Structures are given as C-alpha cells and as structure tokens.
C-alpha cells in the first residue's frame, strides 16, 4: 500500500543512510543532467511509501520538474514499474514516462504528474463535488481493463489470494491484537478463507491495478486538457499489478483505505461502473449483465479479501517496519469487514470472530439486506 510519488508538497531535504548509495545517486543524476536539463542541486524529497521505494523531485532549468525513483535493488525490483507503465500507456492511460532507468542501481528518472492528488481534492463531506473525479477514475479503470490480455501479467491466483489473507491472522490478530486464536476460531478463519478464495477465483479476470484509489490518482493542472477521457487523471503506484478478478479495482476505489463514503455514494459510482462495463462487454458472466445485485455481491466478496489483507499489511507496516501512521486506518477496514460479514449468512462465523477480537456488537445491514 504505497503513497503516490507526488503526494504532498514536501520540500524536505534528502537524507541518506548509506554514503555509498548517496554517492552513486549523485553521480547518476549528474550524468543525466545535461540531456534532461536537470538542476541536481534542487533535489528534494517528494514522498516515501509503504515499501523501500522513495521518490525525489528535481527541477529542470526550464522551470519544470522531474521525479526520481530511488529503489534500492536489494530491496525493490524496479522492472515491474517500467514494464507496467508501458502497458498502461499502451492502454491509453496517463502515467509517468520513464526517461532514464538504471536497473542495476535502482534509479529511474520520470516525468512529473504534479502534486495534486485526487485525494487532496476530495472533501469527505461532499460526495457531489467528488463525483466528477470518480467518473474520470472509471474511464481510466475501464480503459485499463479493456486492454487486458492473458499471460502478460502474473496471475492473481489461489496462492496469492491465500498468502494475502494469511496476513490478517498473522499480523493483525496475533501481532497487533495479541490474540491467540482457539482451535475453533482458527477453523472459522480457514473455512471463511476457503469461501472467499472460491468466490474470487470464479470471477472473470483482467488487469488489476491493486491500489486503484484517490491517493494514487493525480489531477491534471488547471488548463491542461486530456487527449481522451481515460487520460483525465494520472495513475500511479501500479508496479504490483496482476491479472485477476475484475471486481478488485472497483472495490479498491470505493472501499478506500483512507476514506469512507456513505453507502448511497458507493452504490451510485459502482452502478455507473457496472453500466459502462456492461456496454463494454465486461459483464458477460452468469447474470451480471442483467443483475447489478449479483455483480455487487461479487464486488463485496472481493473487497472482503482486500480488507482482510490490508488490515494485516497495515499492522505489519507498523510493527515490523516502524511506519506507525498506517495503523490509524485499521479501524476502517474492521468496519468494512464487519459490515460485509453482517450481510452474508456464510460469513456469520467471521462476524462473530471479529466481534470477539474487537469487543464489538454486530454491525447494521447494507442496502440489499442480508443474503
């Protein structure tokens, strides 16, 4: 779960823990300064993320700016970023252009999509004002999905789904909550995970961004006109993309890691996505084409997998990696988990388990009632 490379407007100086890497970076940047009209003395921190990557901003002599990705090769593989950026560009999306890449050292020079994220533009109390940006996000998402081809990206398969789900008991329950599950509770999780995986693997597949949300979508500067609707927003943090359930990214967009919308707005945007996807031929599966409710139930099951995973990831980021800011958002995911579990009879045991761990009462229902 990464922050966008242009998040915030920080002008913090760049600090280095390894003198050798600092020297290597300085030499690399200087070597590209003339070709790309860079001003190396202007380098400052743009953002860091949940991984070991960080992003630096550097000015050009013409008054523009560029982004440098610092991805230590012993900790981060920069190749997926380069490869998937090309896929997104081929799909017609607005993504950073790779101007220079040193794979051996883990340095990339990128075009700068600016500092204005969709998240920064959103007032959580005003969904009407946010709606146009969400419609733009849908255009980008559909263009990405329609470009899908099998065998291009790694599969979001059973092994990946289960590995992600296991983060919840390993890190959220055991490490963060300090709870040792009973044999019965462990059996509940095993059965629940089996159900989730079964549902997710049955869904139609396509390209999956995996963190398609407002923090990773960039608003163009005023006066900059996109060539197509799919390019209205810039797209970042795509290096972990896979080929998997097409429900994943709409679930990620509407059940945000850092922002909670009321159910009416979630349904409104998801219906708009469904209508567009249906016209594009993406809903030709079982009764999805004619029944929004059937599609939405699939979105909820996919979202449940993501919520369990992210709760575990956020706990791990805090406890293992020392990034305490993420833990503050875990209650949001527990709310998502409980609300979804309350709606489905098969998930009643999961709801009971979560309530036992959290010391909470059962959540209220959602728009379609209990099924």
Describe the residue ranges of each PLM region.
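Conserved catalytic-loop position in the HRD/HxD motif
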Residues: 211
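Active-site activation/catalytic loop segments of kinase-like enzymes and analogous catalytic loops
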Residues: 169-176, 246-286, 301-321, 333-340
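ATP-binding pocket architecture of kinase catalytic cores
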Residues: 46-47, 56-163, 167, 173-178, ...
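Conserved NTP-binding catalytic cores of kinases and kinase-like/nucleotidyltransferase enzymes
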Residues: 1-107, 116, 206, 220-234, ...
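ATP/Mg2+ or Mg2+-diphosphate-binding catalytic cores
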Residues: 3, 309-371
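An alpha-helical support segment within catalytic cores of ATP-dependent transferases
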Residues: 25, 31-34, 149-154, 160, ...
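Catalytic activation segment of kinase domains across protein kinase-like and atypical kinase folds
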Residues: 215-260
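Hydrophobic packing residues in well-ordered alpha-helices of helical domains and bundles
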Residues: 81, 130-137, 161, 186-189, ...
């Amino acid at each position: 779960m990464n922050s966008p490379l242009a998040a915030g407007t920080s002008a913090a100086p760049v600090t280095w823990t390894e003198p050798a890497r600092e020297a290597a970076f300085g030499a690399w940047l200087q070597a590209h300064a003339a070709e790309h009209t860079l001003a190396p003395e202007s380098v400052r921190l743009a953002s860091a993320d949940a991984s070991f990557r960080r992003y630096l901003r550097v000015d050009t002599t013409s008054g523009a700016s560029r982004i440098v990705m610092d991805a230590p090769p012993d900790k981060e593989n920069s190749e997926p970023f380069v490869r998937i950026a090309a896929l997104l560009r081929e799909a017609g999306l607005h993504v950073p252009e790779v101007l220079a890449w040193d794979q051996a050292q883990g340095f990339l020079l990128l075009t700068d999509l600016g500092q204005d994220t969709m998240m920064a533009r959103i007032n959580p109390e005003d969904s009407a004002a946010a709606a146009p940006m969400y419609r733009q996000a849908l255009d980008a998402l559909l263009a990405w999905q329609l470009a899908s081809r099998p065998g291009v990206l790694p599969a979001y398969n059973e092994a990946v789904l289960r590995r992600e789900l296991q983060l919840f008991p390993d890190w959220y329950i055991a490490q963060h909550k300090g709870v040792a599950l009973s044999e019965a509770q462990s059996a509940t999780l095993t059965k629940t995970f089996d159900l989730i995986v079964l549902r997710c693997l049955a869904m139609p597949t396509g390209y999956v961004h995996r963190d398609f949300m407002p923090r990773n979508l960039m608003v163009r500067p005023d006066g900059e006109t996109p060539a197509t609707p799919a390019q209205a927003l810039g797209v970042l943090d795509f290096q972990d993309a896979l080929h998997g359930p097409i429900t994943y990214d709409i679930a990620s967009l509407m059940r945000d890691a850092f922002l909670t919308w009321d159910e009416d707005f979630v349904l409104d945007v998801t219906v708009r996505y469904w209508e567009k996807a249906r016209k594009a031929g993406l809903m030709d599966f079982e009764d999805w084409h004619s029944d929004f409710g059937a599609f939405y139930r699939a979105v909820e099951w996919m979202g449940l997998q993501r919520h369990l995973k992210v709760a575990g990831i956020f706990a791990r980021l805090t406890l293992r990696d020392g990034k305490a800011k993420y833990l503050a958002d875990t209650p949001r995911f527990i709310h998502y988990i409980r609300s979804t579990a309350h709606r489905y009879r098969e998930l009643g045991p999961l709801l009971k388990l979560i309530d036992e761990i959290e010391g909470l009462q059962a959540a209220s229902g959602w728009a379609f009632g209990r099924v």
